[in-house]
A protein has these predicted regions:
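A short secondary-structure junction signal
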Residues: 129, 135-141, 181-184
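Active-site neighborhood of divalent metal-dependent phosphoester bond hydrolases
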Residues: 39-116, 120-123, 133, 139-141, ...
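Acidic, His/Gly-rich catalytic cores of divalent-metal-dependent hydrolytic chemistry
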Residues: 162-258
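Active-site neighborhood of phospho(di)ester-bond hydrolases with catalytic His/Asp-centered motifs
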Residues: 6-8, 29-33, 57-61, 127, ...
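Active-site environment of divalent metal-dependent phosphoester hydrolases
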Residues: 11-15, 37-40, 63-67, 133-134, ...
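N-terminal active-site segment of His-dependent metallophosphoesterases
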Residues: 1-48, 52
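Short, well-ordered beta-strand micro-motif
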Residues: 115, 126-128, 240-244
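Short, well-ordered beta-to-alpha junction loops that form the rim of enzyme active sites
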Residues: 118-119, 127-131, 173-176
């Protein structure tokens, strides 16, 4: 029996083949969103993940934006102008209408959440952005975009039918671990809002020295939440988290491309 991993936010990196080649044939990889945009590989990173039978894909906010943009360019011009969708659209420029329709259908069918039941007896909720256990059920928008749940106390207010909070964990991406380490600090404020995040994000993004530090997975919220977003487009690093043992595995572009 192979190993079961989670990863996220590859953002059109150009070393996706090398990472997939590290997996064994009987491994399973949950990709929890944002295969596309910003990086040089365009749509091809998404295509490779989708075609790999070992990979189970979840929707990220960037996939959701792509599907909306392909449906109506006027609805979401910011996808291209602000969110790195220009690279993805360039890689799709020669595609027929039917091919683009396939992406819309495929993305819209991707799950926003999966619960992995480990044979070791614990459960792992997989979701792109993560969420607060106080907010169940939560909106689809939050599953893809939320950045307000980082100060939660896991065992207080947990509300998921059939899941014991003591043996349940949440793995998410969407927010680069740099942000949690340098912006939130986990101690600055008792609660966070998106306005708080935007206020500090503007200053943080100008500090490229912090952004290029090789990141590692952050485990927080009393050991029950894991952020696995390595900001790959800047750091050239991808993280895999073993969902049974919680072992962390890292792949760096400079090592794989030798």
């Amino acid at each position: 029996m192979g190993r079961v991993y989670a990863t996220s936010d590859w953002h059109s990196c150009d070393f996706y083949k090398e990472v997939l080649n590290q997996l064994n044939e009987d491994d399973t990889l949950y990709f929890i969103g944002d295969a596309i945009d910003r990086g040089p590989a365009g749509i091809w990173t998404f295509n490779a993940l989708w075609a790999d039978k070992r990979v189970i894909m979840l929707k990220g906010n960037h996939e959701d934006m792509l599907a909306q943009y392909l449906t109506s360019e006027e609805r979401l011009q910011g996808y291209v102008d602000v969110n790195g969708g220009d690279v993805t659209m360039q890689s799709m420029s020669g595609m027929m209408h039917e091919e683009k329709e396939w992406y819309i259908r495929t993305i819209n069918k991707l799950p926003e959440e999966i619960v992995y039941h480990s044979p070791k007896g614990h459960n792992v909720i997989l979701e792109h952005a993560g969420y607060s256990p106080f907010d169940m059920p939560h909106r689809s928008h939050d599953a893809l975009w939320d950045r307000t749940h980082f100060s939660d106390e896991w065992n207080n207010g947990f509300s998921r039918d059939g899941l014991d909070p003591k043996t349940t964990y949440l793995v998410h991406g969407h927010t680069p671990v740099h942000y949690l380490k340098f912006i939130y600090g986990f101690k600055d404020k008792p609660t966070w809002t998106m306005a708080d995040f935007r206020e500090k994000e503007e200053f943080f993004n100008d500090d490229l020295e912090k952004m290029t530090i090789k990141p590692e997975i952050i485990c927080y919220c009393g050991g029950h939440k894991f952020d696995i977003d390595m900001c790959t487009v800047i750091t050239d690093r991808i993280a895999l988290l073993d969902l049974d043992t919680f072992e962390e595995i890292y792949f760096d572009r400079e090592n794989l491309k030798k």
